[in-house]
Amino acid sequence: MGIQGFLQKLSGLLLLLCALPWAEGGKVLVFPMEGSHWLSIRDVVRELHARGHQAVVLAPEVTVHIKEEDFFTLQTYPVPYTKEEYRHHLLGHLQNFFETEFSLKLVLQTMAAVNNVSTFYVRSCRGLLHNTALIQSLNSSSFDVVLTDPFFPCGAVLAMYLRVPAVFFLQSMLCELEFEATNSPNPSSYIPRLLTLNSDHMSFLDRVKNMLYPVPWMYLCHVNYGSLARLASDLLQREVSVVEILRHASVWLLRKDFVFHYPRPFMPNMVFIGGINCANRKPLSQEFEAYVNASGEHGIVVFSLGSMVSEIPEKKAMEIAEALGRIPQTLLWRYTGTRPSNLAKNTILVKWLPQNDLLGHPKARAFITHSGSHGIYEGICNGVPMVMMPLFGDQMDNAKRMETRGAGVTLNVLEMTADDLENALKTVINNKSYKENIMRLSSLHKDRPIEPLDLAVFWVEYVMRHKGAPHLRPAAHDLTWYQYHSLDVIGFLLAIVLTVVFIVYKSCAYGCRKCFGGKGRVKKSHKSKTH
């Protein structure tokens, strides 16, 4: 362990020791989201359990990834759909991103897919909030904090109803509602909007696009979150908006870091924990250690399109397999679909792989990823250059940011050929600049006084100890939109200026009439007398 690692461990230990007088074991209600969202919040739950806290994870009976484990109590509630229906609506739309060229049709399909998934979350939330017995049981359990992912903020509604402080754990939200809810400054002049693929240095036309692009997505958010707002209003017996629900958060734990995201202002209750999923790196199992050792001097390439992609269209899978067979490295490909008939000997298909552990191995040469934030951070943490094949959502923006930093190459999964993938892999493996750039990002990312996991746990315990964090809440929440932008002050000052100008103008006009108007009349009367 180097001195930097020792200091990080020491700072984490000191932070823990400082918290010990107050950390007598609290009760944490966890309301996670599905998929990779659960995988990182799960590490926080495990660490809270290790520090003596009792965690209850609340989840629907029908889930894909959330399973009972020994470091938390799983509390489920019935929902009005089957696992097959849920899988179809959660995962089925992904096939479109391999088959449909980018067009208005694809945009509409994407919006429809988001709406379908949101419909399932609304049904799940309704199943919870209308479960009177469960709600009463939770209310009597005296939880100290609710830890939840607000991407679909059912957990935030529950925290409001239980009158328990909430800690939000997230990467981002639809329509970037996290910035509206926290009143973070968000000018479109230099802060790129989600899905625009803009950087923080924009041309005039980029800024026009940046301002207009969010408009249709605001409509989508209004539709998607409107049902939740009505559910919340019924439960709370008063009219509430989604933004008001989100403002209940005491602290926002954001899986962000400025080595990955563009610099921008944030509020004091927004804490960066980017790279939290890199914390638990373990030794490889005998199976994977054997694969890595057999790769020889050429090393390995890790390939995963995430937990949500289970199958790729046959033609595209064969193109990928052909490209992988052309490079000397050993390919470890996480894939659960039909085995491509042209799969080369250097490519090993596995149903699951320890992605972070493999990327941390010295023989890791490249990482083929769909550009999900978890994978990107694991690539940064371990200093492995990337070939990125974004499929949907913020993955496009993630890939753009890494490409602009010279840490990877982006491919269009719809248009790429076997030659394109082969060339991209050879570029990031053989061109030393990619390795140097990703190592520089890795060094910047790791140069911090405390590990993200320790920081996340500290803030959850902080909210428990102090029953919230109202002192971090900016007064901007209490202002109307025109007060926030000082439009009333501007209007008042403008009225004063106009009044002064009007008075000066009238005074000058009156003075001119007095000075010159009388002389004119005298001259006219004198002329009339001479005639």
Swiss-Prot record:
Q: List the disulfide bonds.
A: none
| Location relative to the cell | Endoplasmic reticulum membrane
Which residues does the record list as glycosylated? 116, 139, 293, 431
InterPro entries linked: UDP-glycosyltransferase, UDP_glucos_trans, UDP_glycos_trans_CS
Q: Which reaction does it catalyse?
A: glucuronate acceptor + UDP-alpha-D-glucuronate = acceptor beta-D-glucuronoside + UDP + H(+); 17beta-estradiol + UDP-alpha-D-glucuronate = 17beta-estradiol 3-O-(beta-D-glucuronate) + UDP + H(+); 17beta-estradiol + UDP-alpha-D-glucuronate = 17beta-estradiol 17-O-(beta-D-glucuronate) + UDP + H(+); 17alpha-estradiol + UDP-alpha-D-glucuronate = 17alpha-estradiol 3-O-(beta-D-glucuronate) + UDP + H(+)
Put simply, this protein is called UDP-glucuronosyltransferase 1A3
- Organism domain of life: Eukaryota
Q: So what does this one do?
A: UDP-glucuronosyltransferase (UGT) that catalyzes phase II biotransformation reactions in which lipophilic substrates are conjugated with glucuronic acid to increase the metabolite's water solubility, thereby facilitating excretion into either the urine or bile. Essential for the elimination and detoxification of drugs, xenobiotics and endogenous compounds. Catalyzes the glucuronidation of endogenous estrogen hormones such as estradiol and estrone.
Q: Which Pfam families match?
A: UDPGT
Keyword Transmembrane recorded: yes
**Molecular function terms, GO-annotated:** enzyme binding; glucuronosyltransferase activity
**Species in which this protein is naturally found:** Rattus norvegicus (Rat)
How does the record say this protein sits in the membrane?
Answer: Single-pass membrane protein
The keyword Transmembrane is assigned to this record: yes
Q: For this UniProt entry, what's an example GO CC term?
A: endoplasmic reticulum membrane
Instruction: List the EC numbers from the record.
Output: 2.4.1.17
| One annotated GO biological process | estrogen metabolic process
Assembly behavior: Homodimers. Homooligomer. Interacts with UGT1A1, UGT1A4, UGT1A6, UGT1A7, UGT1A8, UGT1A9 and UGT1A10 to form heterodimers.
PROSITE patterns referenced in this protein's UniProt entry, alphabetically:
UDPGT
UniProt keywords (A-Z) are: Endoplasmic reticulum, Glycoprotein, Glycosyltransferase, Lipid metabolism, Membrane, Signal, Transferase, Transmembrane, Transmembrane helix
